[in-house]
Amino acid sequence: MKRVSDYQFNFRFYRFGLIIVLVIGVHSISGYAQPDMTLKNTLPESGKLVNDNPTGKGWTNLLSSAEEWNFENAFWQLNNNTLRGTINREKEHHYSYTKKSYSDFELVVLIKMVGDEDANSGVCVRINPTSWDDAPGYQVDMGKGYWGSLWEERKAGMVQKYPDSLAMKVAKKNDWNHYYIIAKGHHIQAWLNGVKTIDIVHGTGYAEGRIGFQLCHMHNPTIVEIKSLYVREMK
């Protein structure tokens, strides 16, 4: 027959074990790896562009036809393999996104955002739009306080923050910026101009969705241009 002290010991051991399980469970849902804080260029060969074209086989140009996209003509135009978005003191967000959904993939893009200090945009991955101004899912973000960070619209909010003090040394204001993004399972990685700014396993996010871009409402006009947008799906 067990003594009362035995039951107390077992209960404490059980409680301790439960805490360990919960901690492990939390890390499995949202496991943070370390993005690059050294500002070194660690861009993989697969993410490089040569004459604005990706290297290797299997890449698909996502800007070859407007027929492959959903967007409002009042805010977005696609011509000559360049997608251009313009917003001027509008109250809503305005998204453009592919008609096709993607799950596991590599993505490379050149993107330029021109606006004031508050200008904001983002490369959207695995989004599931409900309207032109609502698109739950991930954004590889752009803008002061957000460059190089991973945001999840309508869900977790800031998933992984890249220090603004470093991001402002990497990002090119009012100029072309290169993003390379890998989404495989719940593991999301991204490089901004060759520097790895996102590396996280986020188990609660969407595993599939559209690829797109955001025009964020601001007090002053913002122009976003996208070119050399290629995707390579993973099997």
Indicate residue ranges for each PLM-predicted region.
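Serine residues within intrinsically disordered or low-complexity segments
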Residues: 5, 28-30
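Bacterial N-terminal signal peptides
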Residues: 17-27
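Compositionally biased, low-structure terminal segments
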Residues: 10-17, 33, 76
